């Protein structure tokens, strides 16, 4: 409650809660429902992953192919380690621990109720018959695909879970395979959209890695490319919650892609606080290098986040008049604004700007 009071968006959320607005009620309904269902999703994920790992007679080849396909040997595991890691992860309790670690992500937890709501809204709009199995498969598949970014980021960033990075390298190809097989249950157009989005996300990841190596080469164009890792993953998931059918596929894509980029800005601010350094690459780093003023850089990052959110809101004006879950989406965007405002206010309160400036000067040499 104190966190909500600390931002204007949070106060607006509290006001809607007191008035029991339609958006608040819809959002709360899905939040409570998915909190109850999340453990079931996690269990399905663990079981599918365990089955895939134990059944693979050539894990070395699987891991090499994944690293080659992604275009990053940093994601590969030394051949001599593969069998030991497979033996460790074949223990279902150990595997469950690793899955829980990568599912312990605000990004994953924020998207689970959203995808459920979008899928239901699209099903109602198109008059689809009820298929719980298909619904679970499409939603689970996209959550798992989004979750793949967690171990990949931890491997590349090397800023948390250092003792588990080999386990994550082993798990990655199986996570992707499970996501694909589940998403395919939505039909060929859904799988095709996913593959196109995943290709774009890989480009974003590749640019991210290049900029980590040469931070001083950052510019607005390669930052926009880097943000494909948010835009493509979230936008594609939004598109496929409508099973890639217009008009909702395009509308959901716009809203979720831009909301994902907006959250990316907030995530960069949160990471700066937690890691006591400006993230490389990030919008704060880009603005700091060009203004020479770290505090101003974070102000501009917040301005950038508002531009992304304004674009996301265009999707609301595109929705069909009879779309029942528009208030849910309006409330969702309010929570996104609160998230960014909260971490920006926390940064200003702590004011680590001089320390950040020294570290940027060292990194950008």
Label each residue range with its predicted role.
Residues 1-365:
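All-alpha prenyltransferase/terpene-synthase fold signal
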């Amino acid at each position: 409650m104190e966190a909500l009071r600390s931002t204007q968006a949070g106060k607006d959320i509290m006001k809607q809660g007191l008035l029991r607005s339609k958006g608040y009620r819809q959002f709360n309904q899905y939040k409570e429902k998915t909190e109850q269902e999340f453990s079931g999703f996690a269990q399905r994920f663990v079981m599918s992953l365990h089955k895939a790992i134990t059944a693979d007679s050539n894990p070395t080849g699987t891991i090499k192919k994944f690293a080659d396909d992604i275009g990053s040997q940093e994601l590969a595991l030394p051949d001599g380690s593969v069998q030991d890691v497979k033996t460790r992860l074949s223990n279902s309790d150990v595997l469950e621990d690793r899955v829980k670690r990568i599912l312990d992500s605000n990004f994953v937890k924020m998207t689970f109720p959203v995808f459920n709501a979008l899928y239901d809204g699209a099903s109602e709009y198109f008059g689809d018959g009820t298929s719980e199995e298909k619904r679970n498969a499409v939603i689970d598949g996209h959550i798992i695909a989004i979750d793949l970014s967690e171990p990949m980021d931890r491997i590349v960033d090397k800023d948390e879970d250092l003792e588990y990075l080999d386990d994550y390298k082993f798990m990655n190809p199986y996570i992707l395979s499970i996501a694909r097989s589940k998403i395919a249950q939505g039909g060929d157009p859904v799988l095709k959209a996913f593959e196109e989005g995943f290709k774009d996300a890989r480009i974003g990841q590749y640019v991210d890695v290049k900029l980590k190596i040469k931070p001083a080469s950052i510019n607005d164009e390669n930052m926009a490319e880097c943000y494909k890792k948010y835009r493509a993953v979230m936008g594609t998931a939004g598109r496929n919650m409508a099973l890639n059918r217009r008009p909702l596929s395009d509308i959901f894509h716009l809203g979720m892609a831009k909301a994902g980029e907006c959250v990316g800005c907030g995530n960069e601010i949160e990471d700066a606080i937690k890691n006591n350094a400006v993230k490389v690459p990030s919008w704060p780093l880009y603005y700091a290098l060009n203004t020479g003023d770290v505090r101003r850089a974070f102000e501009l990052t917040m301005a950038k986040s508002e531009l992304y959110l304004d674009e996301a809101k265009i999707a609301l004006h595109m929705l069909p008049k009879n779309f029942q879950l528009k208030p849910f989406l309006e409330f969702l965007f309010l929570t996104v604004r609160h998230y960014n405002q909260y971490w920006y206010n926390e940064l200003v309160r702590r004011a680590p700007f001089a320390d950040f400036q020294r570290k940027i000067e060292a990194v950008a040499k």
